[in-house]
Swiss-Prot record:
PROSITE patterns: CLUSTERIN_1, CLUSTERIN_2. The lineage of its organism: Eukaryota, Metazoa, Chordata, Craniata, Vertebrata. GO terms for molecular function: amyloid-beta binding; low-density lipoprotein particle receptor binding; misfolded protein binding; protein carrier chaperone; protein-containing complex binding; receptor ligand activity; tau protein binding; ubiquitin protein ligase binding. The gene is Clu. Proteolytically cleaved on its way through the secretory system, probably within the Golgi lumen. Proteolytic cleavage is not necessary for its chaperone activity. All non-secreted forms are not proteolytically cleaved. Chaperone activity of uncleaved forms is dependent on a non-reducing environment. Polyubiquitinated, leading to proteasomal degradation. Under cellular stress, the intracellular level of cleaved form is reduced due to proteasomal degradation. Transmembrane segments: none annotated. This is Clusterin. One of its GO terms (cellular component) is mitochondrion. It comes from the Eukaryota. Changing L371R: Strongly reduced interaction with XRCC6. Most abundant in stomach, liver, brain, and testis, with intermediate levels in heart, ovary and kidney. It comes from Mus musculus. A motif (Nuclear localization signal) lies at residues 77-80, 442-446. Residues 1-21 form the signal peptide. It is a peripheral membrane protein.
Length: 448
């Protein structure tokens, strides 16, 4: 009688929807669901590798553009250096002449200095702010030791060009080194026959040991496997051995780029000429270093401008001709330096573009590689379904919610919750389960 009453009570509870967590599938059904889910994961792996091949093409295109741009840089560098050499020659010839118009220039210089100091310190206090007291003392000494003749022949512009040339050479060398390191790794990665294999190849990414008789992508005699596996590796290759090397090489290439992007060469105080809108910061650094930045403000002082306009041709026509020659070569050198800077910015842009593509490559392929890193066992399924449970009425679980617990290779179990409309009978049931499981796995991978 007690047993009968217990059965009646259970039936009543069942009618009221109070039985939770009823397992609905057999072991055979779990295997079939695992097969269906593994096919979805297999397709996503193919998509990831197809994406990698696309990014590979973009990287190769960027690299070809970089090489072409490097040739233009070399030509521009030669022209710029020739112009700088002409400027230095003219400067040395002009310095060899006795200073003329001294009396006129010295009088103007004495009126120029106070204005230049006031203008410079006002700028420094407003823009640069820190250490104005020390900078003021340095500026006073600098102006007292400077010659109006240096001012008259645009010595500050010449020094600025020479400093820019040094900085540009340093930045180019750093970028070249970065590209050489990253490109070597990328070339090694992309030379593998893995990237030459067509995705429609029947050996490509078929699930391991599925019940139907299809050759799987880790088939021991596959050319793909031979290209990735050392001859010293015997026995059937694993998913881990297939993909983990790619992740490691992509990571190495990224590191080669990132190390250079954050290297001292790129953080050098005066490489700001590579960035737009950084002129004020550059002037601040020049003022702090040796006060020459203040000479850039000579256009704001009338008496300083008058020094540049002094005509000494009456006293020494040859010197006047040399000064004109110097100014002409200086203008050419400044124009070529600006052109070189623009090319260098384009070169830097290609470098940053390659770095961005490597990030995409890592994002596209990282989840596959991390799965490979987890996979050490012999399980024939990419995705294995452990349980499928449907919940009825409960305050914490919505009505008729289906919970599916799966594992991607050797990962920790992942629970996927599906609403009532996505039932086990739905043809897309396992595609939805696999998609959500993969999304959750990738989310956790990024968070780690």
């Amino acid at each position: 009688m007690k047993i009968l009453l217990l059965c009646v009570a259970l039936l009543l509870i069942w009618d009221n929807g109070m039985v939770l967590g009823e397992q609905e599938v057999s072991d055979n059904e779990l295997q079939e669901l695992s097969t269906q889910g593994s096919r979805y994961i297999n397709k996503e792996i193919q998509n990831a590798v197809q994406g990698v091949k696309h990014i590979k093409t973009l990287i190769e295109k960027t690299n070809a553009e970089r090489k072409s741009l490097l040739n233009s840089l070399e030509e521009a560098k030669k022209k710029k250096e020739d112009a700088l050499e002409d400027t230095r020659d003219s400067e040395m010839k002009l310095k060899a002449f006795p200073e003329v118009c001294n009396e006129t220039m010295m009088a103007l210089w004495e009126e120029c200095k106070p204005c230049l100091k006031h203008t410079c310190m006002k700028f420094y206090a407003r823009v640069c702010r820190s250490g104005s007291g020390l900078v003021g003392q340095q500026l006073e000494e600098f102006l007292n030791q400077s010659s109006p003749f240096y001012f008259w022949m645009n010595g500050d512009r010449i020094d600025s060009l020479l400093e820019s040339d040094r900085q540009q050479s340093q930045v180019l060398d750093a970028m070249q080194d970065s590209f050489a390191r990253a490109s070597g790794i990328i070339d090694t990665l992309f030379q593998d026959r893995f990237f030459a294999r067509e995705l429609h190849d029947p050996h490509y990414f078929s699930p391991i040991g599925f019940p139907h008789k299809r050759p799987h992508f880790l088939y021991p005699k596959s050319r793909l496997v031979r290209s990735l596996m050392s001859p010293s590796h015997y026995g059937p290759p694993s998913f881990h051995n297939m993909f983990q090397p790619f992740f490691e090489m992509i990571h190495q290439a990224q590191q080669a780029m990132d190390v250079q992007l954050h290297s001292p060469a790129f953080q050098f105080p005066d490489v700001d000429f590579l960035r737009e809108g950084e002129d004020d910061r550059t002037v601040c650094k020049e003022i702090r270093r040796n006060s020459t930045g203040c000479l850039k403000m000579k256009g704001q002082c009338e008496k300083c401008q008058e020094i540049l306009s002094v005509d000494c041709s009456t006293n020494n026509p040859a010197q006047a001709n040399l000064r004109q020659e110097l100014n002409d070569s200086l203008q050419v050198a400044e124009r070529l330096t600006e052109q070189y800077k623009e090319l260098l910015q384009s070169f830097q842009s290609k470098m940053l573009n390659t770095s961005s593509l490597l990030e995409q490559l890592n994002d596209q392929f990282n989840w596959v590689s991390q799965l490979a890193n987890l996979t050490q066992g012999e399980d024939k399924y990419y995705l294995r379904v452990s349980t499928v449970t449907t919940h009825s009425s409960d305050s914490e679980v919505p009505s008729r919610v289906t919970e599916v617990v799966v594992k991607l290779f050797d990962s920790d179990p992942i629970t996927v919750v599906l609403p009532e409309e996505v039932s086990k009978d739905n043809p897309k049931f396992m595609d939805t389960v696999a998609e959500k499981a993969l999304q959750e796995y990738r989310r956790k991978s990024r968070a780690e």
